[in-house]
Amino acid sequence: MKTPIDPDIVKKFITASGLKSVGLASIRELNRLVTNIEVASGVSFIRMEMGIPGFDPPQIAVEGEIEALQQGVGSKYPPFDGIPELKAGIASFVKNFLNINVAPEGCLPTVGSMQGCYLAMMVAGRRFEGRNKILFIDPGFPVNKIQARVLGLPFESFDVYDFRGARLEDKLRTYLEQGDIGAILYSNPNNPSWICFTDKELEIIGRLCTRYDVIALEDLAYFGMDFRKDYSQPGRPPYIPSVANFTDNYILLISSSKSFSLAGQRIGMTAISPVLFNSAGDNLEPWFGSNRFGYAYIFGGMYALSSGVCHSAQHGLARLLEAVNSGQYNFVEAVQEYGERARVMKKLFTDNGFRIVYDLDEDEPLADGFYFTVAYPGLTGEALVEELLYYGISGISLATTGSKRLEGIRACVSLTGKELFPELKARLVQFNQNHQ
């Protein structure tokens, strides 16, 4: 059976990797394996395994950072809860695009949104005695569960696929009624499935968080990237949906990596509800020196993790937020091509025997965006990941994300420009022919 990549090379590096199962490898492990096969074979892959921005960072952020470095900030420790202009910029950004009021004191940069999630779980899981468990609404970013394990926090999880709409309430109650959940973590839009929670679902999550005094950790890594609506105009509807409309128990975790293409600078944003920030817990002081939530979060939590986010990166992001908040820079328009890529790539897959796994938001077709999910008849997602390596195509198994849809894989569109579509099509045609 002829394949684009020499089978002997693929097998050699799979064996050398020592992985028990290629299809269950972590994103970073798979990324290293694919790179090794690429180098040895001389054949470039269609790289869909890792969510890496496919565009250059905005020039205004680059210039802001260069200017700050030229002014000498590189020799100075930054405020570890953020420079004042960035804190104010984050608060304005949340108001302009979510229509939610947060105070600058509750806004802080983190070393990427990944650190933001880690910090949020660390503090939320220790707010009350006996309520240290994290509930993950899956599928989700695999590393978040690793973070919970490292923190020593127990967790529960469920795949939301069969619990959309009103069914979500009963499912959440089965966990919350146990009385040991400290926080609920989910991403919206969702990584890996690209489902987007509806206002009905966010209202359920928010209302139950208030009822059971649980914190909603809302991972907005793909901020404004549900391209079915235009969320690009500051201070004007439609506003990006958020659980913050339905509860005061929220922490918003906003990435700069995808929406702003600033992945390399490792700077994310956290916005804490003013009510939560000024609240108290009975178990924070032993861990963070104070039972006051906001004080514990910053002076006990953030300070323990870092002496602050890169000083110049803070200035670059602050400059960018100023442009975004004023309407000078349209960040949604800058990344809208991801949606067009997804639309074309989905069709290339479905034209060649694949089907979309997560395909609906309740009764509405899923948006075209940064990720999509596919399956092929007769293969599990675990097997499909390995089989596609012989065709120079890489993705990750949904099994690694907490999904119960074990037949599927996640594909990221960011590194597949339009110039690669003919090659992707040819490889998928060959794959389908070889598996008839």
Task: Cite the ranges covered by each PLM segment.
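Conserved core of the PLP fold type I
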Residues: Q70-Y212, L217, F223-F246, A426
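Short hydrophobic/aromatic beta-strand micro-patches
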Residues: A271, T373-A375, C412-S414
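Conserved glycine-rich beta-strand-loop-beta hairpin in the small C-terminal domain of fold type I
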Residues: H311-Q314, A318, F331-K346, T350, ...
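AMP-binding (ANL) adenylation modules
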Residues: G54, S257, D361-E364, T400-S403
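PLP-dependent enzyme catalytic core of the Aspartate aminotransferase-like
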Residues: K2, S92, N96, I100-V102, ...
